[in-house]
Protein backbone atom coordinates (compact mmCIF):
# COMPACT_ATOMS: atom_id res chain seq x y z
CA UNK A 1 0.00 0.00 0.00
CA UNK A 2 3.02 2.34 0.07
CA UNK A 3 2.58 4.95 -2.63
CA UNK A 4 -1.10 4.13 -3.12
CA UNK A 5 -3.86 6.72 -3.05
CA UNK A 6 -5.88 6.30 0.14
CA UNK A 7 -9.02 8.29 0.81
CA UNK A 8 -11.94 9.58 -1.24
CA UNK A 9 -11.53 11.20 -4.64
CA UNK A 10 -14.77 12.75 -5.90
CA UNK A 11 -14.39 14.05 -9.43
CA UNK A 12 -17.69 15.91 -9.15
CA UNK A 13 -18.49 14.95 -12.77
CA UNK A 14 -15.28 16.49 -14.12
CA UNK A 15 -13.52 14.95 -17.13
CA UNK A 16 -9.81 14.36 -17.69
CA UNK A 17 -8.99 14.76 -21.39
CA UNK A 18 -6.11 13.27 -23.39
CA UNK A 19 -4.46 11.20 -20.67
CA UNK A 20 -1.15 10.12 -22.24
CA UNK A 21 1.38 7.51 -21.13
CA UNK A 22 3.82 5.69 -23.39
CA UNK A 23 6.31 4.85 -20.66
CA UNK A 24 7.66 1.52 -19.48
CA UNK A 25 10.22 0.21 -17.04
CA UNK A 26 13.22 -1.94 -17.85
CA UNK A 27 14.61 -4.71 -15.69
CA UNK A 28 17.87 -2.93 -14.93
CA UNK A 29 15.90 -0.35 -12.95
CA UNK A 30 14.09 -2.88 -10.75
CA UNK A 31 13.55 -2.20 -7.07
CA UNK A 32 12.25 -4.33 -4.22
CA UNK A 33 8.65 -3.68 -5.29
CA UNK A 34 9.22 -5.40 -8.64
CA UNK A 35 8.88 -2.21 -10.61
CA UNK A 36 5.13 -1.89 -10.51
CA UNK A 37 5.32 0.94 -13.00
CA UNK A 38 2.03 2.77 -13.31
CA UNK A 39 0.35 4.04 -16.47
CA UNK A 40 -3.22 4.81 -15.38
CA UNK A 41 -4.48 8.05 -13.88
CA UNK A 42 -4.26 6.37 -10.46
CA UNK A 43 -1.29 4.04 -10.28
CA UNK A 44 -2.63 2.27 -7.21
CA UNK A 45 -5.47 2.80 -4.73
CA UNK A 46 -5.82 1.21 -1.31
CA UNK A 47 -8.86 1.43 0.99
CA UNK A 48 -10.02 4.21 -1.31
CA UNK A 49 -13.05 5.46 -3.20
CA UNK A 50 -12.86 7.02 -6.66
CA UNK A 51 -16.15 8.33 -7.98
CA UNK A 52 -17.88 10.70 -10.41
CA UNK A 53 -14.99 11.01 -12.86
CA UNK A 54 -14.54 10.60 -16.61
CA UNK A 55 -11.45 10.07 -18.75
CA UNK A 56 -11.79 10.81 -22.46
CA UNK A 57 -9.42 10.15 -25.35
CA UNK A 58 -6.84 8.31 -23.26
CA UNK A 59 -3.72 7.12 -25.10
CA UNK A 60 -1.81 4.53 -23.08
CA UNK A 61 0.86 2.26 -24.56
CA UNK A 62 2.92 -0.16 -22.50
CA UNK A 63 6.14 -0.80 -24.48
CA UNK A 64 7.32 -4.31 -25.32
CA UNK A 65 10.43 -3.85 -23.16
CA UNK A 66 8.40 -2.99 -20.07
CA UNK A 67 9.18 -5.50 -17.32
CA UNK A 68 6.73 -4.28 -14.71
CA UNK A 69 3.98 -6.77 -13.98
CA UNK A 70 0.31 -6.95 -13.26
CA UNK A 71 -2.35 -4.31 -13.57
CA UNK A 72 -2.66 -1.74 -16.31
CA UNK A 73 -5.86 0.29 -16.60
CA UNK A 74 -6.92 3.69 -17.88
CA UNK A 75 -8.39 4.88 -14.58
CA UNK A 76 -6.60 2.62 -12.06
CA UNK A 77 -3.74 0.18 -12.54
CA UNK A 78 -3.86 -1.63 -9.19
CA UNK A 79 -6.89 -1.63 -6.88
CA UNK A 80 -6.95 -3.05 -3.33
CA UNK A 81 -9.95 -3.07 -0.95
CA UNK A 82 -11.47 -0.11 -2.78
CA UNK A 83 -14.53 1.23 -4.58
CA UNK A 84 -14.97 2.81 -8.00
CA UNK A 85 -18.36 4.35 -8.71
CA UNK A 86 -19.88 6.35 -11.57
CA UNK A 87 -16.72 6.61 -13.68
CA UNK A 88 -16.04 6.08 -17.38
CA UNK A 89 -13.19 5.90 -19.88
CA UNK A 90 -12.73 6.33 -23.61
CA UNK A 91 -9.64 6.14 -25.82
CA UNK A 92 -7.18 3.26 -26.00
CA UNK A 93 -4.78 1.14 -23.99
CA UNK A 94 -2.24 -1.13 -25.68
CA UNK A 95 -0.12 -3.63 -23.80
CA UNK A 96 3.22 -5.07 -24.77
CA UNK A 97 3.60 -8.48 -23.18
CA UNK A 98 7.24 -8.85 -22.27
CA UNK A 99 5.88 -9.96 -18.88
CA UNK A 100 2.31 -10.70 -17.81
CA UNK A 101 -0.12 -7.82 -17.99
CA UNK A 102 -3.70 -7.63 -16.74
CA UNK A 103 -5.27 -4.91 -18.84
CA UNK A 104 -8.67 -3.31 -18.33
CA UNK A 105 -10.57 -0.43 -19.86
CA UNK A 106 -11.21 0.92 -16.37
CA UNK A 107 -8.98 -0.98 -13.91
CA UNK A 108 -6.11 -3.39 -14.45
CA UNK A 109 -5.76 -5.69 -11.45
CA UNK A 110 -8.03 -6.10 -8.41
CA UNK A 111 -6.54 -7.36 -5.17
CA UNK A 112 -8.73 -8.20 -2.17
CA UNK A 113 -12.35 -7.12 -1.69
CA UNK A 114 -13.42 -4.50 -4.22
CA UNK A 115 -16.54 -2.95 -5.74
CA UNK A 116 -17.07 -1.33 -9.14
CA UNK A 117 -20.50 0.08 -9.98
CA UNK A 118 -22.24 2.38 -12.46
CA UNK A 119 -19.18 2.54 -14.71
CA UNK A 120 -18.52 2.05 -18.41
CA UNK A 121 -15.76 2.04 -20.99
CA UNK A 122 -15.73 2.39 -24.76
CA UNK A 123 -11.95 2.05 -24.97
CA UNK A 124 -10.00 0.05 -27.54
CA UNK A 125 -7.94 -2.53 -25.64
CA UNK A 126 -5.08 -4.35 -27.36
CA UNK A 127 -2.74 -7.07 -26.14
CA UNK A 128 0.41 -8.07 -28.01
CA UNK A 129 3.15 -10.63 -27.58
CA UNK A 130 6.42 -10.54 -29.51
CA UNK A 131 7.63 -13.98 -28.41
CA UNK A 132 10.92 -12.60 -27.08
CA UNK A 133 10.51 -13.02 -23.32
CA UNK A 134 13.13 -15.19 -21.65
CA UNK A 135 13.41 -16.12 -17.98
CA UNK A 136 16.11 -17.75 -15.89
CA UNK A 137 15.40 -21.46 -15.52
CA UNK A 138 17.48 -24.45 -14.50
CA UNK A 139 20.03 -24.80 -17.24
CA UNK A 140 19.90 -21.16 -18.34
CA UNK A 141 17.53 -18.79 -20.09
CA UNK A 142 14.45 -20.30 -21.68
CA UNK A 143 11.66 -18.75 -23.76
CA UNK A 144 8.51 -18.22 -21.71
CA UNK A 145 4.83 -17.94 -22.60
CA UNK A 146 3.09 -14.91 -21.15
CA UNK A 147 -0.36 -15.11 -19.63
CA UNK A 148 -2.20 -11.86 -20.08
CA UNK A 149 -5.82 -11.19 -19.18
CA UNK A 150 -7.88 -8.47 -20.83
CA UNK A 151 -11.33 -7.15 -19.96
CA UNK A 152 -13.51 -4.27 -21.01
CA UNK A 153 -13.86 -3.06 -17.42
CA UNK A 154 -11.28 -5.07 -15.42
CA UNK A 155 -8.24 -7.03 -16.53
CA UNK A 156 -8.17 -9.62 -13.73
CA UNK A 157 -8.95 -10.38 -10.10
CA UNK A 158 -7.45 -13.38 -8.32
CA UNK A 159 -8.16 -12.81 -4.61
CA UNK A 160 -10.97 -11.60 -2.37
CA UNK A 161 -14.62 -10.95 -3.12
CA UNK A 162 -15.43 -8.56 -5.96
CA UNK A 163 -18.73 -7.14 -7.18
CA UNK A 164 -19.09 -5.48 -10.58
CA UNK A 165 -22.58 -4.05 -10.98
CA UNK A 166 -24.47 -1.80 -13.38
CA UNK A 167 -21.49 -1.56 -15.71
CA UNK A 168 -21.18 -1.83 -19.48
CA UNK A 169 -18.52 -2.08 -22.17
CA UNK A 170 -18.89 -0.79 -25.71
CA UNK A 171 -15.34 -0.67 -27.05
CA UNK A 172 -13.22 -3.38 -28.65
CA UNK A 173 -10.65 -5.91 -27.49
CA UNK A 174 -7.98 -7.19 -29.87
CA UNK A 175 -5.41 -9.77 -28.83
CA UNK A 176 -2.54 -10.66 -31.15
CA UNK A 177 -0.59 -13.91 -30.79
CA UNK A 178 -0.93 -14.31 -27.07
CA UNK A 179 -2.35 -16.64 -24.46
CA UNK A 180 -5.06 -14.60 -22.82
CA UNK A 181 -8.53 -14.97 -21.36
CA UNK A 182 -10.58 -12.15 -22.81
CA UNK A 183 -13.93 -10.89 -21.52
CA UNK A 184 -16.26 -8.01 -22.19
CA UNK A 185 -16.46 -7.16 -18.48
CA UNK A 186 -13.46 -8.97 -16.92
CA UNK A 187 -10.74 -11.09 -18.45
CA UNK A 188 -10.27 -13.48 -15.54
CA UNK A 189 -12.04 -13.36 -12.19
CA UNK A 190 -11.96 -15.54 -9.10
CA UNK A 191 -14.63 -14.71 -6.54
CA UNK A 192 -16.19 -12.11 -8.85
CA UNK A 193 -19.94 -11.43 -9.04
CA UNK A 194 -21.34 -9.52 -12.02
CA UNK A 195 -24.82 -8.01 -11.68
CA UNK A 196 -26.80 -5.97 -14.22
CA UNK A 197 -23.90 -5.71 -16.66
CA UNK A 198 -23.98 -5.27 -20.43
CA UNK A 199 -21.55 -5.97 -23.25
CA UNK A 200 -22.67 -3.75 -26.12
CA UNK A 201 -20.09 -4.75 -28.72
CA UNK A 202 -19.16 -7.81 -30.76
CA UNK A 203 -15.58 -6.61 -31.21
CA UNK A 204 -14.09 -9.03 -28.72
CA UNK A 205 -11.69 -11.79 -29.65
CA UNK A 206 -8.22 -13.27 -29.75
CA UNK A 207 -6.22 -15.81 -31.71
CA UNK A 208 -7.77 -18.63 -29.69
CA UNK A 209 -11.53 -18.19 -29.54
CA UNK A 210 -11.75 -20.82 -26.82
CA UNK A 211 -10.34 -18.16 -24.47
CA UNK A 212 -12.92 -15.50 -25.36
CA UNK A 213 -15.97 -14.89 -23.17
CA UNK A 214 -18.76 -12.38 -23.53
CA UNK A 215 -18.66 -11.44 -19.85
CA UNK A 216 -15.46 -13.04 -18.58
CA UNK A 217 -13.83 -16.21 -17.36
CA UNK A 218 -15.15 -16.34 -13.79
CA UNK A 219 -14.42 -18.95 -11.10
CA UNK A 220 -16.39 -19.48 -7.85
CA UNK A 221 -19.00 -16.77 -8.48
CA UNK A 222 -21.55 -15.96 -11.15
CA UNK A 223 -23.37 -13.36 -13.20
CA UNK A 224 -26.96 -12.22 -12.78
CA UNK A 225 -29.14 -10.23 -15.16
CA UNK A 226 -26.30 -9.63 -17.60
CA UNK A 227 -26.58 -9.28 -21.37
CA UNK A 228 -24.38 -9.51 -24.45
CA UNK A 229 -24.87 -9.01 -28.21
CA UNK A 230 -26.53 -12.29 -29.14
CA UNK A 231 -29.45 -11.35 -26.87
CA UNK A 232 -28.72 -14.29 -24.59
CA UNK A 233 -29.09 -13.79 -20.87
CA UNK A 234 -27.10 -15.44 -18.13
CA UNK A 235 -28.78 -15.84 -14.73
Where are these regions (language model features)?
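Predominantly extracellular beta-rich ligand-binding scaffolds that present long acidic/polar faces
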Residues: 1-235
Amino acid sequence: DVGSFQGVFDGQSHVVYNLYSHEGLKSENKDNNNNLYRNGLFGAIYNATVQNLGIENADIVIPMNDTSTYGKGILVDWMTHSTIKNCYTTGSITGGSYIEKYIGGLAGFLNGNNSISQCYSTAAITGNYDGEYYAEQEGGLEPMDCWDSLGGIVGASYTGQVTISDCWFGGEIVVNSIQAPVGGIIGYGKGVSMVNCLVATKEIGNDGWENTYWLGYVVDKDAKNCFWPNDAKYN
